[in-house]
Amino acid sequence: MMKLTCVLIIAVLFLTACQLTTAETRDEYRAVRSSDEVQNSRSTDDCSTAGCKNVPCCEGLVCTGPSQGPVCQPLA
């Protein structure tokens, strides 16, 4: 019984280590990234690539359309 417990603990530790090493390249494991990387990914949330009524358009886009539903479009 003790050997089985040890094997299970080692397996869990190994799988956790595998997830942490691949977490740097995957977006699905954001919780394990450093706080700087998370802040950098959040900085892109300050602009919009779609509607621009409440959030300004991202760089390279301009807000056009009626006041009820303006959208972000590429600069011409």
From Swiss-Prot:
One of the Pfam families matching this protein, by short name: Conotoxin
Propeptide residues, per UniProt?
Answer: 24-42
Compartments where located: Secreted
Q: State a single Gene Ontology molecular function.
A: ion channel inhibitor activity
Q: Does the keyword Signal apply?
A: yes
* A GO-annotated cellular component: extracellular region
Similarity section: Belongs to the conotoxin O1 superfamily.
Please state what the protein is called. Answer: Conotoxin VnMKLT2-013
The uppermost taxa in this organism's lineage are: Eukaryota, Metazoa, Spiralia, Lophotrochozoa, Mollusca
